[in-house]
Every structure is written in structure tokens, then in C-alpha cells.
Amino acid sequence: MAILTFALLGIAFVPASAQGRDIPVPRSCSPQVNTKLQEMIEDQPRGYVENVMVCGIAEGTRVNSGGRHGSHHIITLKAQLPQGRTVRVQVAVNDSLDGPVSALRGDQVFAYGQGYISGGGWAAGIHDVHCATHRTADNGWVVVNGQKTPTFCR
């Protein structure tokens, strides 16, 4: 009956599991923006951590073509943590879900999505920088020099 009521009123019914919260982009990049990132790096979790934000200055972008999850643009950032340390973080942008997003050396980048410990030359990474695809995630995004992708989520 509730679905019929929504249909009669012209309201779309979307399962709650597909709707994430919209988290605003900070006005400026400060070490405090990277607080949850720092906590994740200190904790070294084995799995993913939902709703992690990073901001920093891009070192550049490389493209990983193909693979199990499709092509990705990988943006490498230098991010300053609240305790004063600077770390390298990768932002993995899925070309199929997010569209290709890249950053040049020196660009300011913010990203919000699912965090992970990446190893190698990076202290951590952020992916799922797109509209929420599961119920425990907020809507993710990546912002390069003020240009946000995605621009909105349904």
C-alpha cells in the first residue's frame, strides 16, 4: 500500500540501501580534514574503512587499464596528517562508475569514500569515490581544483 501511495503521489521509491548521505566538501584543506585517515593508518585495518576523507596536493595521475574492476585513474596525493606527518595517498577513481578523473602535479584534491591500507609507496588509499552502492556507505566524491565528481547523487 505504501508503494502504491508513493506511486500515486509521483514520488520515486528507492531502497534505503542505495541512498547514502551527502557529506559536504570542506572549504579548505587542513590537516584536521585527514583525521580519520590518520586513525586508519595508525590502526592498520585488514579490510576497508567506510567514509574516509583525504585532502592534499597531487603528485600526478596514472591509468590502470582493464582488470577485474575495470580501468581506474590513480591520483597520488601528498596529505598532511594532524600530527604533522606527510604521507602519500592514492585515490582510485573507477572510470566506469565515476568517469575518468585526473589531477596534475600541484592540483588541490579532496576525496571521500572507502579507505584501505595499500602498501607499497602509499600509506593508504581511498576508492568508492562515487554515489553509494551499499547501505553502510555515504555518497563518495573526488574534487580536483574545485571541480566535484559526481556533481550529485540520486
Per-range role (PLM):
Residues A18-R154:
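OB-fold and OB-like single-stranded nucleic-acid-recognition modules
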Residues A2-A12:
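Bacterial N-terminal signal peptides
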